[in-house]
A protein has these predicted regions:
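Small-residue-rich hydrophobic transmembrane alpha-helices
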Residues: 44-103, 107, 140-154, 158-159, ...
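Single conserved hydrophobic/aromatic residue that forms the stacking wall/gate
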Residues: 1-8, 13, 341-345
Length: 346
């Protein structure tokens, strides 16, 4: 009974900041959609089409980096604290390689949209938005790798505070660039994408500054091995990367299907695409909340695995199922109004 109570409380401690961070991230997308949708329905279609490609380009490398979270959590649970910093540094180098690869792929946005059979208008405007989006990939991966490390060492609130601040920044910057206020040019969907880029740069700078502050603290630096980095990092991180392969494949399957359906919606025109964007926007928020619960579960399970606690693994897994099911049942009862997204009756 005591173990059940401990696992439940640990799940709540882990889940609260991680879920809050994911909800805030989902809200950022909802706010972007509302601002652009109320500005112009066609612009909403362009940003939706660009995002359907972009979501694949940035979630695949995030899936590949998931091993950092799991392996670092295992080491933390086994009280091998210095190994967590080594895994973080390996992930930092790995994320740099992934950023180059997926940014170069994304720059070819117009070519990708043309190959998918989109009309010239969608290719031109959707490609412009996608080009802005892809330049945020390096900053996303810097943030994600550092945040995975901090979550694994029981510092999930750092990411939560960052994403809340990022939401506030986005609410201020987004309408200014979309509508062209205070002397800024009116950029529409490109302005919203630019705001997203600015916010992601802020997140990367914020979380890396926190890590740097930890490094300057001799006690924390030594405890977590933040200076541990070797020329053999590629071979050393083989098992960590292997964990990410399966998660990346799952990501391709889920987000790939979303991109395919988005392509179909794009073929049917701007209004159909805009409607599809609103529908996906809401469902994505629900998915991100459930995904955050799974992340919290994986951390607690990995900690239990690291200390050889089989009963703790089972208890944490069951707690994750219960919390997820309860959350889903609660969320599906929530109704939303499309008028929040656009005033276009069509």
């Amino acid at each position: 009974e005591m173990l059940r109570s401990l696992v439940g409380s640990e799940m709540c401690i882990r889940d609260r900041p991680i879920t809050t961070a994911f909800v805030a991230m989902g809200l950022m997308g909802i706010i972007d959609t509302m601002i652009v949708g109320n500005y112009n329905t066609d612009q909403l279609a362009y940003i939706g089409l660009a995002n359907s490609i972009f979501v694949v380009l940035f979630t695949i490398p995030i899936g590949l980096l998931q091993g950092v979270l799991i392996k670092s959590s295992q080491k933390f649970g086994a009280h091998k604290f210095q190994s967590t910093g080594k895994i973080y540094n390996e992930g930092r180098k790995y994320s740099f390689i992934l950023a180059i690869v997926f940014t170069l792929l994304g720059i070819q946005g117009e070519t990708i949209l043309r190959l998918l059979g989109q009309d010239d208008d969608m290719v031109k405007h959707g490609g412009e938005v996608l080009r802005v989006f892809v330049f945020s990939i390096p900053f996303i991966l810097m943030y994600v790798n550092a945040n995975f490390f901090l979550q694994s060492i029981r510092r999930p609130y750092v990411g939560m505070y960052g994403i809340i601040a990022a939401n506030i920044l986005n609410i201020i910057v987004n309408p200014v660039l979309v509508y062209g206020k205070f002397g800024f040019p009116e950029l529409g969907a490109v302005g919203s994408a630019t705001s997203t880029l600015i916010v992601r740069i802020f997140l990367a700078v914020y979380i890396l500054a926190y890590i740097r502050r930890m490094k300057k603290n001799p006690k924390l630096n030594k405890r977590f091995g933040l200076d541990r980095s070797y020329s053999t990092w590629w071979n050393d991180s083989r098992r960590t990367r292997k964990i990410g392969y399966g998660i990346a494949i799952m990501t391709i399957a889920t987000n790939g299907s979303f991109s395919i359906v988005s392509t179909f919606a794009g073929w049917m025109g701007q209004h159909t695409m805009a409607t599809f964007v609103i529908m996906i926007n809401v469902s994505t928020l629900l998915f991100m909340i459930c995904f955050s619960i799974s992340q919290a579960t994986s951390i607690v399970v990995a900690n239990a695995y690291g200390r050889g606690d089989r009963k703790g693994i089972l208890m944490a897994t069951n707690a994750g199922y219960v919390i997820s099911l309860t959350t889903i049942i609660t969320l599906i009862t929530i109704l939303y109004s499309c008028l929040l997204y656009t005033s276009d009756a069509a």
